[in-house]
Amino acid sequence: MRHIIQTATAILLLTANMQGLYAKTFLPPEEVKTIKVGDTKVTWLQDNGSKQRAAIFPGVPQSLLDSLGVADGIPSSMSTFLVEREGKQILFDTGLGKVGSRLLPLLESLGIKPEDIKYLYLTHFHGDHIGGMLDGDKVVFPNAEVYASKKEYEAWMNMPPEKNRQAVKTMKAYKERLHLFEFGDTLPGNIIAMDAAGHTPGHTAFLAGKALIAGDIMHGVALQLVRPDVCPTYDMDKDAAIASRKRILSYAKKNGLLLCGMHFPAPAFLKLDK
């Protein structure tokens, strides 16, 4: 009897271990989703998830919020994307990088270490996009070539210290591997940097084949698809942000692109019907 119990216990332990291995190997976390679009593989990584407060969209009628079912908050996320294209693996943005950040564990679930990241493209310099680049004073992605808009870089470097402290510190830490591009430039991986300015001075969208990494083009998809003229308080130049939002959405719709947005609701992919 004792032998039978020991054997049964061993089988249960082995089964549990195998299930754990299977889960780790074959079942990605709920914050990860990969889509293949043409010759490009895009993996969504949810650094964090939350709703956007309706209050960040001033002037929106309560009746509209009620009709859309978002009066208590607009579904959103804090996301990054990993793109594999033309033999290159590129990380777009790094999330908030503070307690609760999921980026590094999610990369680990894919078998990717921070030092494996060779290319890091930035949509803009807000803290929830560059925050994961540093851990205190330590560089998180020591082998990454960092690409950012020249317009974005120059604008932030010339802001008052109380606004640009994080951006200055972060860019300084990566200065030996920092590459500044102009809108329209083609970057490694045959990825085109597109003008999406307005949210920030050099806010950038990235065209990767049939996928478009749209950055912060929309913070509240449910609302801004209906009213693209509505801006969150985070948009620095609201007129430019509206123009960029309408242009990017129109371009994506016309060309049948997969939109990938850092604050789209999970999973942060969107394709608009023509």
What do the predicted segments below correspond to?
Residues 1-8:
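Bacterial N-terminal signal peptides that target proteins for export
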Residues 91-94, 118-128, 147-149, 195-198, ...:
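Active-site neighborhood of phospho(di)ester-bond hydrolases with catalytic His/Asp-centered motifs
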